[in-house]
């Protein structure tokens, strides 16, 4: 729509529309810098996943099923902070826009209101990850460290609450330390444009 990728909201939750679902890049990325612009509808929720894996598990009937990308991928949160209830959940605003979802809050929180374009930046380099929002760095963290494991254990991705997600995220990117980038279909209207990826050697 007008040069952007638009997710048409189903209004019934995450990836529930018959023609919906997360949009995932065709190949994996290791060390990279991703920049784009996004805007969200009023009360909307989405996210940008990175270092995600294709993981299959068994359902209750013993059939193979593909796990949702959030089980294996850190998430740069996309949210209408003013209206969506998730903005007040979690800890210390760690579910607001540009936060590492449910793990680290974006500081400063400088998102523009629903319906306005925001700039997002994600840098991944040899285990160091940084999020930027509207030309400001808002958080940095380090994968595959004791601190990373402790963060997971104090979140909704803890070993007790979601053992598979904990295992996958604790070894984020798998053995090759690389994974898929994806845009989340959370059932709300969201737009992405000017998507650029720079490979970092």
Segments the model singles out, each with a brief description of its role:
Residues 1-201:
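Carbohydrate-interacting regions of secretory-pathway proteins
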């Amino acid at each position: 729509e007008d040069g952007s990728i638009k997710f048409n909201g189903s209004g019934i939750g995450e990836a529930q529309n018959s023609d919906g679902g997360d949009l995932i890049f065709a190949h994996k990325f290791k060390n990279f810098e991703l920049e784009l612009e996004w805007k969200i509808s009023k009360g909307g929720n989405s996210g940008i996943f990175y270092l995600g894996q294709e993981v299959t598990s068994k359902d209750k009937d013993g059939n193979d099923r593909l796990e949702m990308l959030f089980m294996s991928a850190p998430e740069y949160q996309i949210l209408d902070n003013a209206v969506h209830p998730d903005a007040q959940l979690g800890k210390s605003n760690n579910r607001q826009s540009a936060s590492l979802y449910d793990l680290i809050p974006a500081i400063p929180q400088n998102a523009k209101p629903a319906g306005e374009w925001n700039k997002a930046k994600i840098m991944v380099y040899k285990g160091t990850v940084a999020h930027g929002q509207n030309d400001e760095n808002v958080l940095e963290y380090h994968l595959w460290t004791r601190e990373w494991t402790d963060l997971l254990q104090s979140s909704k991705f803890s070993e007790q609450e979601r053992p598979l997600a904990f295992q996958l995220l604790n070894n984020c990117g798998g053995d090759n330390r690389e994974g898929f980038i994806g845009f989340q279909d959370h059932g709300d209207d969201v737009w992405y444009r000017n998507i650029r990826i720079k490979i970092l050697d």
